[in-house]
Amino acid sequence: MALSLSLFLGGRVRAAVARCGFASQGVAGPGSISREPDPDSDWEPEERELQEVESALKRQKKAMRFQKIRRQMEAPGAPPRTLTWEAMEQIRYLHKEFAESWSVPRLAEGFDVSTDVIRRVLKSKFIPTLEQKLKQDQKVLKKAGITRVVWQLPVSEDTLKPLSAGHPMSGPLLMPGDEVSSNSQTHSRALKVKSNAPSAEAQKKREEKNKRIRVLAESLVPTTTALGHQRELQKYTTHDSEADRRANNHILPSVEKLEELEAGEPGDQNFSSKVVQKGREFFDSNGNFLYRI
């Protein structure tokens, strides 16, 4: 009886060992003998699940090690803020309403920040007060190069009443139709006034510059016109004087002068009454030029 029981258990153990050998052939060493998988074996799916669990654990350990190294390399505490509260509300709104088109990488590219910053914004549930928002936004804008002070903006009680009522804000969101709290509305108005101030000053400077240019141009136009008229008059005067001088040089002699030349003067011994014509020019007998026709 004992012999038969030992033989039966030995056969079961050998069969189990054989099945384990067939199932573990995929993870055997380089020197092991390859065997064909047993189609009737029940160990193959279990072995596959075990390998998947092991790979998942390895990936998790690798990610945890990477996070630990990154925390050690970064400065302690929260990273410096680079987004205003209005920008963070836009990020949450776009990711919530248009998750397919506005993914985390696209939001990071659109707002010029890293994907870690976008994930921190989406994960955060902190709701600050109005003073905290203004103070943090002032730090962000000051770091970005905008030195306008928001605290100097006059805020009256009449202005704060509709804000506390929670009216919808038509601020410069990327997608319209969103309703935000009174804190974000006050912050939006403060940012709008602050962003419009430099543009208004620049516009005023451009208008003053254009006005000075127009006045200078208008003052130069009459002077230029007068100089042009003066040059034209000088040109025509010079032309007329040259024409008169040429006409005086080439003008025909009068009839009296011709008669005197032909009759001759008795007191002039060098004068000859003979006139010689050469082409259109007339000379006396001595060869002196008289006139030209």
UniProtKB/Swiss-Prot annotation:
GO MF entry, a single one: rRNA binding
Residues of the signal peptide: 1-15
Keyword Nucleus part of the UniProt annotation: yes
Main localization, broad class: nucleus
Stretch list, region Disordered: 25-48, 162-211
Glycosylation site residues: 270
GO biological process: cell differentiation; mitochondrial ribosome assembly; positive regulation of mitochondrial translation
GO CC aspect terms: extracellular region; mitochondrial matrix; mitochondrial membrane; nucleus
Disulphide-bonded residues: none
Phosphoserine modifications at: 41
Alphabetical UniProt keywords: Developmental protein, Differentiation, Glycoprotein, Membrane, Mitochondrion, Nucleus, Phosphoprotein, Secreted, Signal
Compartments (UniProt record): Nucleus; Secreted; Mitochondrion membrane
PANTHER family the record matches: NEUGRIN
Record function comment: Plays an essential role in mitochondrial ribosome biogenesis. As a component of a functional protein-RNA module, consisting of RCC1L, NGRN, RPUSD3, RPUSD4, TRUB2, FASTKD2 and 16S mitochondrial ribosomal RNA (16S mt-rRNA), controls 16S mt-rRNA abundance and is required for intra-mitochondrial translation of core subunits of the oxidative phosphorylation system.
Family label: Belongs to the neugrin family.
Name listed for the protein in its UniProt record: Neugrin
Source organism: Rattus norvegicus
The organism's taxonomic lineage, starting at the top: Eukaryota, Metazoa, Chordata, Craniata, Vertebrata
Gene giving rise to this polypeptide: Ngrn
